[in-house]
Amino acid sequence: MHIFDELKERGLIFQTTDEEALRKALEEGQVSYYTGYDPTADSLHLGHLVAILTSRRLQLAGHKPYALVGGATGLIGDPSFKDAERSLQTKDTVDGWVKSIQGQLSRFLDFENGENKAVMVNNYDWFGSISFIDFLRDIGKYFTVNYMMSKESVKKRIETGISYTEFAYQIMQGYDFFVLNQDHNVTLQIGGSDQWGNMTAGTELLRRKADKTGHVITVPLITDATGKKFGKSEGNAVWLNPEKTSPYEMYQFWMNVMDADAIRFLKIFTFLSLDEIEDIRKQFEAAPHERLAQKVLAREVVTLVHGEEAYKEALNITEQLFAGNIKNLSVKELKQGLRGVPNYQVQADENNNIVELLVSSGIVNSKRQAREDVQNGAIYVNGDRIQDLDYVLSDADKLENELTVIRRGKKKYFVLTY
């Protein structure tokens, strides 16, 4: 299947400039293309993965990727469809974020092998040395204010106010495309659909300043079946950095994907063939309660982002917590699996009687409730049911001398630390 058709079939193409010309270019030989990543945090998140994996698919088809990290544009801030001005970051902060993002991208793109190996570039390399006068004379003169004001991303901010700093962002992104075209013969840019205005600023600059044609592909901004923006878990971004979102948390995110989204997400976020995904769809629809699509999705994406060992660990944590086998997990695994659950620091002189601890830690509100829960068999210490009102937690209950896991009922976990 032609790479362009595969991208379409997978739901990865939202808009293109000239589909026929782009398809022809991809057929005739190796195309150099780029995707830009502004450092707005110290990690990329799941929302970035759509463009990253699209870039990887094109590389696997023989085309050459350039990964542009915005060391300069990250200092400015992209106004596209944002309700308010971004806070400006210091150069040291942005530089640190650039390094983190560069490391993450190397997990997905091949920077080492073949004539189409990926190349990392930083737009601070050209913006850092250009003077304001040169910027206005050599770049700004090719953009009319009318053209810049016509961008949807700018229109939405005019009434609430937009600084010249952010207004000029589209020119900077346009110049990125121009520089990469002149220096590396890059003719295609890939980005999110919210970037259309900035990306076509690049094709406009190429046309007017160099009389060349540039192409653009935007990938869709992913939403779930309810229309909710994709890539958030409990309102927080799902990060690609395991220190910010653990492999277990990412695994759970994919396992909780709605049935209506699961097959679509397999096409977007995995490298399984379309035939394999069709087979999974048939099995999934025959027995949706088995959640085959979610299991495959979780396996494929966690392995892709964090590696096979991290996936196996996330799966093991899931299975052991579900079975209540707390003692089968290391403290490291427990910290990953129980990150975010209520945590209580036990004082050295504290009464360690189970009833007293249930109240002092805030697990229950009263001693009466604590006694009822214990007598009814609703309290577990490290997976063991405790029904003795006189039970006192001892050193044996301190896993690796660090923590004790209390479970109330079937699913409510609490962690005591020492």
Swiss-Prot record:
GO CC terms: cytosol
Protein residues bound to L-tyrosine: 34, 169, 173
Q: What is its main location?
A: cytoplasm
Where does the record place a coiled coil? none
Mind listing the GO biological process terms from this record? Answer: tyrosyl-tRNA aminoacylation
Q: Which residues bind ATP?
A: 232
Q: Which reaction does it catalyse?
A: tRNA(Tyr) + L-tyrosine + ATP = L-tyrosyl-tRNA(Tyr) + AMP + diphosphate + H(+)
Q: Give the main EC class.
A: ligase
Which stretch carries the motif 'HIGH' region?
A: 39-48
Q: Where in the cell is it found?
A: Cytoplasm
Which Gene Ontology terms cover its molecular function? ATP binding; RNA binding; tyrosine-tRNA ligase activity
Signal sequence segment = none
The reply on keyword Cytoplasm is yes
Matching entries from InterPro entries are given as: aa-tRNA-synth_I_CS, aa-tRNA-synth_Ic, Rossmann-like_a/b/a_fold, S4_RNA-bd, S4_RNA-bd_sf, SYY-like_C, Tyr-tRNA-ligase, Tyr-tRNA-ligase_bac-type
Motif 'KMSKS' region positions after renumbering to this chain: 229-233
- Sorted alphabetically, which keywords does the UniProt record give? Aminoacyl-tRNA synthetase, ATP-binding, Cytoplasm, Ligase, Nucleotide-binding, Protein biosynthesis, RNA-binding
EC code: 6.1.1.1
User: Any idea where the S4 RNA-binding domain is?
Assistant: 352-418
Q: What does this protein do?
A: Catalyzes the attachment of tyrosine to tRNA(Tyr) in a two-step reaction: tyrosine is first activated by ATP to form Tyr-AMP and then transferred to the acceptor end of tRNA(Tyr).
What does the sequence similarity comment in the record state about its family? Belongs to the class-I aminoacyl-tRNA synthetase family. TyrS type 1 subfamily.
Indicate the quaternary assembly: Homodimer.
Q: Please identify the protein, giving its name as recorded.
A: Tyrosine--tRNA ligase
- Tell me the organism's taxonomic lineage: Bacteria, Bacillati, Bacillota, Bacilli, Lactobacillales
